[in-house]
């Protein structure tokens, strides 16, 4: 019996990836439940092993209410066990659609928590690099406004002067400076938050097309609109917030601190109801066309 098996009882499987299986685990003494990610080290390629090491290093460093926490780590010659905080609410967008509708103030509340978590990461010189709906999970089924950032597989810890140049992320959310291959920094996460906010408020992404190159062309020029049919009831402060994130010039893009001080996040009490029909359509379409850039 391994050390982790002495402490935790492994219950049902929660999910699996190419090299890992996630189980529901229960501490035998406290009865507290966790998600335990079991990674088969022998099957890892060099790139995946490097990303995994970076992910673990990051998880060890962070402690924020809106970031999924690493509780314990067990390393054996064959396997790595990550004992993680258990979140049970599912993916953010799925739960919004399930709820049927929500308000602009709800959206601002969610975005504020995401920006707070990203600002915390940036303060530690950590860039997530792959912020998207699938990586935004609800902590519980009961509270649709308590969100947590997950999946640090593409994240990097950066030095003060290091500029990253590896193309990574998911097409609809990737920042123009990543596509330009001229190097990029923390600002990429703020661009992704702009895209996520746009979708939260209307149900579809700002950049879309029949092919990935078409999407990239729109991103490179920040070519997007606020169609009146879907944005007529949304506040000008929300549009201004998005407009200050989806900026090609990174020097003009809001950082996390400035974003938290934006009027839309500081004092939003709008009860404008947001319909989720378009978001439901987007989720279905997204599941059909899951595509990633080469990491």
From Swiss-Prot:
Keywords: ATP-binding, Kinase, Nucleotide-binding, Phosphoprotein, Serine/threonine-protein kinase, Transferase. ATP binds at residues 14-22, 37. GO terms for biological process: adenylate cyclase-activating G protein-coupled cAMP receptor signaling pathway; cGMP-mediated signaling; mitotic cytokinesis; regulation of chemotaxis; signal transduction. It comes from the Eukaryota. One of its GO terms (molecular function) is myosin light chain kinase activity. Residues 264-295 are annotated as: Autoinhibitory domain. GO terms for cellular component: cytoplasm. The keyword Transcription does not apply. The modification Phosphothreonine is found at residues 166, 289. Possesses an autoinhibitory domain. Autophosphorylation appears to increase the enzymatic activity. Activation is gbdC-dependent. Does not have a calmodulin-binding domain. Residues 8-265 form the Protein kinase domain. Its EC number is 2.7.11.18. Pfam families: Pkinase. Autophosphorylated. Transiently phosphorylated on Thr-166 and Thr-289. This phosphorylation is gbpC-dependent. The active site is at 130 (proton acceptor). It catalyses: L-seryl-[myosin light chain] + ATP = O-phospho-L-seryl-[myosin light chain] + ADP + H(+); L-threonyl-[myosin light chain] + ATP = O-phospho-L-threonyl-[myosin light chain] + ADP + H(+). Belongs to the protein kinase superfamily. CAMK Ser/Thr protein kinase family. CaMK subfamily. Phosphorylates a specific serine in the N-terminus of a myosin light chain. Phosphorylates regulatory myosin light chain (mlcR) during chemotaxis. mlcR phosphorylation increases the motility and actin-activated ATPase activity of myosin, contributing to chemotaxis. This is Myosin light chain kinase A. It comes from Dictyostelium discoideum. The gene is mlkA.
